[in-house]
Structures are given as structure tokens and as C-alpha cells.
């Protein structure tokens, strides 16, 4: 009995240690979130580093009000950039992935390799040529220019995700569609698109998060009237002339992070389904 019970106790101990370690990491993650939330609801005279751990003596939304006033233009710009850019890049990536996996043509492997190569080119390497291109197109400093930059840079990863996802779809479905006389677009619309929800969820979350959190493109290619929330947040952090307004800064950080959290909460189950279905598998 003792020999049989020992492995069970050992396994239980290992599981308990794993649970304690995981809870410790969760706690380390939640501590800054706690400070953010608590400080954002403090009046200005209570919001200072010495009392960061304490609850507000007087709960106030003044920090949220001032944060909203300061970030609203940036939030609107970020929504325009991230929503339109993620949808466009996902659609283009889906079409590319379909052609490269199911409607192949001579040289398809070379084209796919070039797409993969584009994933490994750092932003900094193309920033100056990209700025010159947008200037020539009269899109420099505009929201449309930022959307174009993000879409172009997001197409390679979107193409990879969709191509690897579509590889898992049986070729017999495509052949049956061809036998019925359907062309490329009809096959894509009737056969491929209805089963593409998991891959779209992966690419939309990926691209939305990337575009929402972008700072470098926005600063280098944007202008004050097209700056997204990340740039506005940076300006807010350095806008205190006399004293740092910690309540406003914490509320601003929370406001800037809420949209990406909401997107993941809404599409998270599809995101995991897309990963499990092979969206990121070779």
C-alpha cells in the first residue's frame, strides 16, 4: 500500500508546487494592475508614490475625466487605424493564403518565400524609404498613410497564417468546386471563406494589437492630427508642468489598454481555436 501511494503523493506535491508558482506569477502581474486602478481613482492630492498601495481616502473620477479629455483624439485615431488596417490586412492575407495553398501557380513557392522574407525586415530598416514613399503619395502625416504602412508590413504574417491554415483544408473540396465550374473567386467565397473564422480571429487580434500598440510608425510617419493613443499617452506622461498627475497617468494607461483587452475577450475563443486548428503550424 505504501509503495502504491507514494507516487500519488509525489504527484500531488508536484501539482501543488506548480500551483504555488503560477499563483506567484499571477500575483506579480496583478500588483501593477492594482496600483493602476487604485491610483486612477484617487484625487490629485492623494495620488503620489508614497501612498501607491493604499486605497483612496476619497474616491474620485477626476483622473479619468482629464485622461479622457487628453486621449480622446488619440483613441479615435487609434480606432480608425487599428480597425481598418487589421480588416484590410486580414482580407488580403486570406486571399494570398488561398492562392498560395489551393490555387497554385508557377513560382508560388518563390512568392511565398518573399512574403516570409518580409516578416524579418525590421521597421527601422524601411522607415526612411517608407516615409519618402508616403510623401510622394501625399499620404505623409495622415491616418490613411499610417493604415497603408501597417497593412503593407502586416501582409506577410497574415499570409503565413492563412496559408498554413488553408493547407489543412482537404484539396477534394477545391477540386469538387472546380468540377462544378466555379472559378477562383467563387471557390474562395463559397468554400474557403465560410471555414476561415478561426484564422481571421488570429490575424485580426494579432494585427489589431500590433497596430494599437504601435509607437514608432506613429511618431515617424504621423502628425499631431493623426497621432494615435500611444503617442498621446506619451505626451500626457510628460505634460505635468509643476507636479506629476499620477491619477491622470494611471487612468490614461488603463484607457489605452482597454480596447485590446476587449478585442481578446470577444475573439479569444476563436483565437485559441485558430491556433489549435493549425493557423500557426507549418
Question: Over which residues does each language-model region extend?
Answer:
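Short, Lys/Arg-rich, polar N-terminal cytosolic tail immediately upstream
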Residues: 1-12
Amino acid at each position: 500500500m505504501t509503495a502504491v501511494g507514494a507516487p500519488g503523493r509525489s504527484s500531488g506535491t508536484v501539482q501543488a508546487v506548480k500551483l504555488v508558482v503560477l499563483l506567484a506569477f499571477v500575483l506579480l502581474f496583478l500588483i501593477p494592475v492594482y496600483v493602476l486602478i487604485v491610483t486612477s481613482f484617487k484625487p490629485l492630492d492623494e495620488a503620489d508614490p508614497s501612498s501607491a498601495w493604499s486605497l483612496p481616502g476619497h474616491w474620485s473620477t477626476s483622473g479619468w475625466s482629464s485622461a479622457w479629455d487628453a486621449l480622446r483624439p488619440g483613441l479615435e485615431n487609434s480606432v480608425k487605424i487599428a480597425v481598418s488596417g487589421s480588416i484590410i490586412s486580414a482580407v488580403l492575407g486570406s486571399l494570398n493564403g488561398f492562392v498560395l495553398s489551393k490555387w497554385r501557380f508557377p513560382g508560388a513557392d518563390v512568392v511565398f518565400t518573399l512574403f516570409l522574407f518580409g516578416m524579418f525586415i525590421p521597421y527601422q530598416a524601411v522607415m526612411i524609404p517608407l516615409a519618402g514613399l508616403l510623401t510622394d503619395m501625399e499620404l505623409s502625416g495622415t491616418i490613411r498613410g499610417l493604415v497603408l504602412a501597417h497593412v503593407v508590413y502586416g501582409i506577410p504574417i497574415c499570409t503565413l497564417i492563412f496559408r498554413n491554415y488553408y493547407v489543412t483544408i482537404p484539396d477534394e473540396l477545391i477540386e469538387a468546386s472546380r468540377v462544378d465550374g466555379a472559378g477562383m473567386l467563387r471557390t474562395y467565397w463559397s468554400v474557403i471563406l465560410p471555414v476561415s473564422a478561426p484564422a481571421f480571429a488570429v490575424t485580426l487580434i494579432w494585427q489589431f494589437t500590433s497596430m494599437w500598440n504601435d509607437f514608432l510608425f506613429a511618431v515617424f510617419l504621423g502628425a499631431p492630427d493623426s497621432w494615435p493613443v500611444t503617442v498621446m499617452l506619451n505626451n500626457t506622461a510628460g505634460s505635468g508642468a509643476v507636479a506629476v498627475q499620477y491619477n491622470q497617468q494611471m487612468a490614461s494607461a488603463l484607457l489605452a489598454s482597454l480596447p485590446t483587452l476587449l478585442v481578446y475577450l470577444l475573439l479569444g475563443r476563436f483565437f485559441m481555436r485558430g491556433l489549435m486548428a493549425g493557423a500557426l503550424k507549418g
